[in-house]
Amino acid sequence: MSPTPTGSRSIIACSLLLMTACASSGWSGDTSNDMTEQTRVRARALGLRLGQLEPGPLNAITDVPGVKVGHVTLIRGEGPLQPGQGPVRTGVTVVVPREDVWHKKVPAGAFVLNGTGEMTGLAWIAESGFLEYPIALTNTLNVPRVANGVISWMLRRYPGIGITDDTLTPVVAECDDGRLNDIQGRHVSEADVVHALDDATAGPVSEGTVGAGTGMISYGFKGGIGTASRRLPAADGGFTIGVLVNANHGRRPELVMGGVPVGQQYATAPTHSSVAPDPNPERFHASREGSSGNAEGSIIVIIATDAPLDSRQLTRLGKRAALGLARTGSTARHGSGDFMLAFSTGNIIPHYPTEPTFSLTHLADTHLNAVITATVEATEEAILNALTGATTVTGRDGFRVEAISIPRLRALLSSDVTIRR
């Protein structure tokens, strides 16, 4: 049995009649959805072995030494949308690259596959080549408040910022959760961000309907947070590459898992359970396409590694993460915001160097291929873990997004049909 994820705080309010539908990782709002609320699993538990490299012990971004993840999940209210009040299905997820990252900066690089969205702070990363504060993920309209939370947390730890020290431009990445959440309410508070950062840990990472992923939809199913990692053989340096995603992208017919066209076959998948074929597999697409601003979705990909890479190489890793995204079926549609940010803990960039020069270890480009492969594999698996870890959610106006059915997946991914890479 996997270790219990830590670094996650949930704020969930439910009526007594619906209390059984509440869970720390999400809330269905309804307990009658056949078998979709059975115990959630990770992709590997379904027999998927994505690529050739082995995962780290946690198969998570926190396998990279020093990296921490924290969540705050907000689930309150039900029924019709009351703008500014609820229902609330949202949250914040933070990634802390290392302790004292302000003084021990990490090399970083970013890539924007399609720019219908926002990740703040990228101009300074491109200019400086490093990252010097935590990364936060949230919903689109909550970006300014979440940035305030990151700033407040940093000011508490480094009171000289803006007085005797430099200022900062936080990195906050967004996806639109407005189909399930009262996004106008901007319910993630400054205090929520501080809690997420204070509670961030290096242990197992909660996935699916948690933190920034609480209101996300991916490939026509409940999406959200997913993570995975790869550890290179000693001959390739023994480095670890970890990925965390917030998956809010894709259309159901596009979904591919382990080479199997799951999205196309899902509605008629045979199972040995009580799950009946979906009588109207297009109902989700019709309702989503008819809603404003949320027809094509987005994905945020955070890549961490202890390989000693510079900003240019990390930007290259961000580009390769797009290949892992494509393996799951995504085509980076016109209205999708697909942002990749990579950082390395393999070097320390000092805050104010006392000498005019300092030394960094650098992995030769000719030895980069294994790291590239690991990034592609971990990105693909992190997306699938987001899907298999998510739980069904009923949000504003009674809109319901089903979690992908584990029994149907087992049938589709059985040994006689699964395509192995």
Per-range role (PLM):
Residues 1-3, 23-24:
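Short intrinsically disordered, low-complexity coil segments enriched in acidic
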Residues 2-14:
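Bacterial N-terminal signal peptides that target proteins for export
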Residues 7, 26-29:
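Residue-identity detector for glycine
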Residues 13-21:
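Bacterial N-terminal signal peptides
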Residues 22-23, 415:
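Polar helix-capping/helix-linker motif
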Residues 29-421:
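Alpha/propeptide regions of enzymes that mature by internal proteolysis
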